[in-house]
């Protein structure tokens, strides 16, 4: 084998290996290190400069050379051992980390391991009609065989979408401010608090004062009791007649009570008042109650009571003073006249309001019919708005202009349901078609996901043949004030129905009583040529075009802040 050299100070060290022999043949190479690896190692020291360092005077001294040689031997041995140790350690670590992870020690008997249910079981627990209604950050609308799916933002072009999203978010935030949203976080009562206090139900009108019920102190005895109440939107006071040294901060946002008399403290707390100092609506003030390290908080709601809008049914409470029938017609005068005649057969004196956006106005000779004309083709929902805006009775019955009243069209039954329940709208059926559907909402940051399912939620208490649902057919009785509050979007001009119930979700409580049935006129073509021409024109407006569908999707995305529907 060859030799390899390296410099140490002013000396040259040459390491040679060749079997078990030294290759230099010099006396200095007579000391062997023994066998290592492939053979014995030989070290040769060659003085490079006799005049260098401490060896200048003894450059030829064997004793000094042997000592230095011995040191180098030790260094080489240490180096070899280090390399061997490093290789062994690497193999050991590799074996350790490549081996399976050891099992964690099992908990002691009787100790329950803390864990949540797997997602599959959570889905089963919190699913309704195939939809997982558990709080989560994002939602999605999955289409199925019976129900298609829509992603509403697809109604916009990709270049327009960023600006639309920005405007939509700004309008949504404005809506939230007006509605007092999001609601305040839940108040959590800490354990072992020394206070008694209201957790819900304290309300005050703007600029009014109310007593705060239920305040009490149940802490341990103390030389001096100090209790501090703090508000943020109003001021605090007490009706107790006590010195200012006992109660500080009357009429301020912070009220401090300090006394050594426990009974007096109880009396003062029983008569604490809250005053709204600003004209605000739908606000919640969180009042804190503190003593030493204990803190309790409770809400005070600031809002006006709802002003009622009542309809006088008259001393005899006749049906005509309770119900108005409303309809919208377009290019179907013959259908409208047949429907009106059927109404008069069963309800001769009920007021009927007709909104018409046909080209040619009709002449209707009926003292109980109010007929309103509109610009031609103004639209389906615009006509609905016009009709219900003229209703002056407690209830309004909506019908299509091609319906047919019969002996099973019992308006009184629907009135009885609304009078005895909290429903806002109750539908019947059209020739047995109930068309009940449920709307389920999942909320997320980018907009809610709307799920539509056919059917109903539950039976209606007190009316075994009726149910609670989200939407019904175009034959329904409704509280006039509620219907006017939700309204019909006039931008929906042609094909629209479910959109009204989507707008009313969260406002309208809807039911269905299929036993109340209205008929439908024949769909067979008419013989009269003029009427046939009108029907042909009507059908061109009736069709749902791709442009109209895209418009409705965009409307749901922006107006209703929906993300998708399925």
UniProtKB/Swiss-Prot annotation:
Motif position, Vesicular targeting: 9-15
Lumenal-facing ranges: 89-566
Gene3D superfamilies (UniProt xref): Spore Coat Polysaccharide Biosynthesis Protein SpsA, Chain A
Region of interest (ER exit and post-Golgi subcellular localization), ranges: 1-22
Domain of life: Eukaryota
Pfam families per record: Glycos_transf_2
InterPro entries noted in UniProt: Glyco_trans_2-like, GM2_synthase, Nucleotide-diphossugar_trans
Keywords assigned: Cytoplasmic vesicle, Disulfide bond, Glycosyltransferase, Golgi apparatus, Membrane, Signal-anchor, Transferase, Transmembrane, Transmembrane helix
Keyword Ribosomal protein: no
Transmembrane segments annotated in the record for this chain: 68-88
MF GO annotations: acetylgalactosaminyltransferase activity
Keyword NADP part of the UniProt annotation: no
Cytoplasmic-side positions: 1-67
Pathway: Protein modification; protein glycosylation; Glycolipid biosynthesis
GO annotation terms (biological process): lipid glycosylation; negative regulation of cell-cell adhesion; oligosaccharide biosynthetic process; protein import; protein N-linked glycosylation via asparagine; skeletal muscle fiber differentiation; skeletal muscle tissue regeneration; UDP-N-acetylgalactosamine metabolic process
Tissues with expression: Widely expressed. Highly expressed in colon and to a lesser extent in kidney, stomach, ileum and rectum.
Cellular-component GO terms for this entry: cytoplasmic vesicle membrane; Golgi membrane; membrane
EC number, UniProt record: 2.4.1.-
Record field: catalytic activity: an N-acetyl-alpha-neuraminyl-(2->3)-beta-D-galactosyl derivative + UDP-N-acetyl-alpha-D-galactosamine = an N-acetyl-beta-D-galactosaminyl-(1->4)-[N-acetyl-alpha-neuraminyl-(2->3)]-beta-D-galactosyl derivative + UDP + H(+); a 3-O-{alpha-Neu5Ac-(2->3)-beta-D-Gal-(1->3)-[alpha-Neu5Ac-(2->6)]-alpha-D-GalNAc}-L-seryl-[protein] + UDP-N-acetyl-alpha-D-galactosamine = a 3-O-{[alpha-Neu5Ac-(2->3)]-beta-D-GalNAc-(1->4)-beta-D-Gal-(1->3)-[alpha-Neu5Ac-(2->6)]-alpha-D-GalNAc}-L-seryl-[protein] + UDP + H(+); a 3-O-{alpha-Neu5Ac-(2->3)-beta-D-Gal-(1->3)-[alpha-Neu5Ac-(2->6)]-alpha-D-GalNAc}-L-threonyl-[protein] + UDP-N-acetyl-alpha-D-galactosamine = a 3-O-{[alpha-Neu5Ac-(2->3)]-beta-D-GalNAc-(1->4)-beta-D-Gal-(1->3)-[alpha-Neu5Ac-(2->6)]-alpha-D-GalNAc}-L-threonyl-[protein] + UDP + H(+); a neolactoside IV(3)-alpha-NeuAc-nLc4Cer + UDP-N-acetyl-alpha-D-galactosamine = a neolactoside IV(4)-GalNAc,IV(3)-alpha-NeuAc-nLc4Cer + UDP + H(+)
Family as reported in the entry's similarity comment: Belongs to the glycosyltransferase 2 family.
Summary of the function given for this chain in its UniProt record: Beta-1,4 N-acetylgalactosaminyltransferase involved in the biosynthesis of Sd(a) histo-blood group antigen. Catalyzes the transfer of N-acetylgalactosamine (GalNAc) group in a beta-1,4-linkage from UDP-GalNAc to the galactose residue of NeuAcalpha2->3Gal-R to form Sd(a) glycan epitope GalNAcbeta1->4(NeuAcalpha2->3)Gal-R.
Assembly with partners or alone: Homodimer; disulfide-linked.
Known disease link: Sd(a) polyagglutination syndrome: A condition characterized by red blood cells agglutination upon exposure to almost all human sera, but not to autologous serum or the sera of newborns. The condition becomes apparent during blood typing and cross-matching in the laboratory. SDPS depends on the strength of expression of the Sd(a) antigen on red blood cells. Most people have weak anti-Sd(a) antibodies in their serum, which is usually of no clinical importance, but can result in red cell agglutination if they are transfused with cells showing strong Sd(a) expression.
Protein name: Beta-1,4 N-acetylgalactosaminyltransferase 2
Organism field: Homo sapiens (Human)
Upper classification of the organism: Eukaryota, Metazoa, Chordata, Craniata, Vertebrata
GN (gene name): B4GALNT2
